[in-house]
């Protein structure tokens, strides 16, 4: 059986603020911002190059704002990605080496959205697999 992850739901307290953060600062593509009915709003955005999107909204059972931890993005060049995110106004950690030097995928940086949902940005290198 083949399965693909389609959407990650992020609980936020202010949809417009989160939409601006993810689309304008982080650089996600806005897929849609719709109101299926008077009590619901669904905003879906996709990271560039990703097949999986994030959804935020109103009237959705998404949990407490800021409760999602450790969503992960993968990039080819972490230094460049960190510089770009920082230049766009995203507070991002220093690059951290979390495994042996040269190990596949051992470099990370971290950021949070305005509600405290946290993200890891991982550099996927061509080093040996563990």
Regions found by a protein language model. Name each.
Residues 2-3, 9-52, 87:
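Core segments of cupin and vicinal oxygen chelate
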Residues 3, 32-34, 41, 73, ...:
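Vicinal oxygen chelate
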Residues 58-75:
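Helix-adjacent hinge/juxtasegments
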Residues 48-52, 62-63, 78-80:
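Short, charged/polar surface micro-motifs in flexible loops or helix N-caps
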């Amino acid at each position: 059986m083949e399965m693909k992850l389609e959407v990650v739901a992020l609980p936020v307290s202010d949809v417009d603020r989160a939409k601006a953060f993810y689309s304008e600062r982080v650089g996600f593509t806005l897929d849609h911002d719709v109101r299926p009915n008077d009590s619901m709003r669904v905003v879906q955005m996709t990271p560039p190059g990703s097949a999986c999107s994030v959804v935020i909204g109103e009237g959705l059972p998404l949990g407490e704002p800021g409760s999602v931890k450790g969503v992960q993005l993968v990039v080819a060049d972490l230094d460049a990605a960190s510089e770009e995110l920082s230049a766009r106004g995203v507070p991002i950690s220093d690059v951290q080496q979390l495994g042996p030097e040269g190990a596949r995928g051992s470099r990370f940086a971290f950021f949070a959205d305005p509600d405290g949902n946290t993200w890891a940005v991982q550099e996927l290198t061509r080093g040996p697999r563990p």
